[in-house]
Each structure stands twice: as structure tokens, then as C-alpha cells.
């Protein structure tokens, strides 16, 4: 079983992430993590923080000479802005007079619509939004991307599985559904300003972001994550919490601002008749196969061996420059929401985070099925399974 946790706040000294259950023998380095974290910062429409925030990452445990040792993998991602926030976010008590002249220390009392602010204050009996927004911030996703990068290395080295994402919609602009990108398109996708494979759609998306920025507004969109090389049989039909599609949906819905998930053709299948909704089976040169992949690579809660295809819908960023109406919780009077530094559109980055979450779920499912204390053992068990499939 693979388990992972993250800790840390947006303006704290660092984010910390722990991945437990990974086999020994997986090759991974801090430079690979750094490259992955840089991908998370890319995308047209990002805010000022992305231009000066850089991620200084290090392994704290579980790795020796670029190879996992079988113990928990611990990762630390430093916050280069920490000196500015040292007093405001200090773990130990700070004398009030030391905070009095710091604008950053002023209580935040105007909750932002669409954020965790208001309900977080209610739940945790707070009169200041700061403790809520610090942890609810999407800055936490840097830790998820780091963990997902380690999981991706395991998937690639143990099973040849590759996961990639691309943007299929920003605001009202949608990219063509076909062709699907492959791992060979990864660099081309990342080189695009909005991580969209279709040049015409990309240009229209950029224009839409420019228009939203001019209007003091924000945009959401849809990302698609694809998994190549999955064997049949990851997940299970026997219990709700072992179904692969359910685990993927939960993981994607856990990402900040994600409000919808679909697997394969998803909601479109609800508008079709059954004869046009399912994937018919035939014998191919390489064994049993499906003529189509409307299911998105899962049936009955298990991977089918076809390409995994999941989509996640991201709502527009809740911190709107043209501040939305709210109240000041100290007075109960109408007010404008606080306007923290933010992005116009973070959909391209959301795809990178979605990749990481899918990689973590697939790594967990692969270990659940094939086990292994060393990556060589996992690889051997997988090959033995494939060699002895009753129906192929």
C-alpha cells in the first residue's frame, strides 16, 4: 500500500511531503523533481508570484545516491519568500509589539467567495482567515507534484507506464477531441503557452485569457490526463474503495478548484443509446482488444489495458481582481473580498498537478496488484502475470 501526506503552509518556511511504501531500486534525483516543479509554474495567465517564486527541493530521507532504499521518501520544498513572513507565520509565539507594524500581520476578515475562507472560519472557530488560506492555498500542490514525480519514476521503471496531461478547454474555447497526444508529444505540449496540443485552440485560449485579464476576471477550464501502458486488472470490482475509477476521481477532485471529473466519454455516454456507448470486443493480432475506448480504459472498476483517459474541470480562480461582494466578519457589514496576489488562469498548471495525482493512484494500484520490495520484483511479478493471462 502506498501512502502519502503533505504538510506546510503557503507562506511557511517549507512544504514537506512523505511517500511511504515505495519499493527499493527506483532511480530518482532532485534535478528530476526540480524539472517537474518548474512545469507546475508554467502556463499563460499565471500571476506575479510565478515569476519570482522558485522551488528549492531536497530529499530528507528514503533516497541514497539517486536510488530509493525502501523506506519512506521525505521531500522538503523551501519557500524563498520565508524571510518576509518569518514573524507573521512563526510557529512559536511572537510578541504583539513585534507584529504591530507589520501589514502582513493584520487580521483578514473579508472572506473570498469560492474559497475555503468563510466555512473554514466557521468550522475552526476563527476570526482571521489567515490560518485557513495558508493551508487551503494551491501552493500545497507543489508537494503533490514532487510526490507524483517519484511515483512516475516507479511506474516507468516497473511497468513502462507513462502519464501525461494536456489542456482541452479554457473558458468557452475547446480543443478538438482527437487526436489524443502520446508521450512523444510531452515536450511539444509543455512548450505551448497553455499546454494545448492544437495550435488554433491554443491561440484562442490565450486571447480568452487576455480578455479576462483586461476585464479584471478569471477563467477555468478542463484538463485531460492520459495513461499509456497500463496492464489489464489494476483496481477491482469487489469493493467501492478498490475501484480504480473511483480512486482516480477522488484524487482529482481533491485538487484545489476542481469541481468535476469524468472517465472516458463520461457525461456524453448518458446522452447515447447503449449500442453506441460501449466498447465492442474483438480478437486482434496482439490478443483481445476493444474497437473503441469510450470507457476511458476502465470497466467494472478495473483497468482494461487500453489508454486511460480522465478529465477534470477546474472552476475559475476564486480570487477575482474585480473583487466580489462579501461581508466583514468583524462588523457584519457589506464589503469587498480581500484580493491576494493571484492568477488569471491556472488550468495549464492544474494539468501538471492532475498528472501527479493520477501517477500516485496508479502506483498504489500497481503495488496492490503486484507488490515487490524492490522494483525488479514488481517488474518480475507483472511479467509473470502478463505471461499467464487466461484470456489475452
Swiss-Prot record:
Reduced FMN (FMNH(2)). GO terms for cellular component: cytosol. CDD domains: Chorismate_synthase (cd07304). Its cofactor is FMNH2. This is Chorismate synthase. Pfam families: Chorismate_synt. GO terms for molecular function: chorismate synthase activity; FMN binding. NADP(+) binds at residues 40, 46. PROSITE patterns: CHORISMATE_SYNTHASE_1, CHORISMATE_SYNTHASE_2, CHORISMATE_SYNTHASE_3. Belongs to the chorismate synthase family. GO terms for biological process: amino acid biosynthetic process; aromatic amino acid family biosynthetic process; chorismate biosynthetic process. The keyword Acyltransferase does not apply. Keywords: Amino-acid biosynthesis, Aromatic amino acid biosynthesis, FAD, Flavoprotein, FMN, Lyase, NADP. FMN binds at residues 135-137, 256-257, 300, 315-319, 341. Pathway: Metabolic intermediate biosynthesis; chorismate biosynthesis; chorismate from D-erythrose 4-phosphate and phosphoenolpyruvate: step 7/7. Homotetramer. Its EC number is 4.2.3.5. It catalyses: 5-O-(1-carboxyvinyl)-3-phosphoshikimate = chorismate + phosphate. This reaction introduces a second double bond into the aromatic ring system. InterPro entries: Chorismate_synth (IPR000453), Chorismate_synth_AroC_sf (IPR035904), Chorismate_synthase_CS (IPR020541). It is an enzyme of class 4 (lyase).
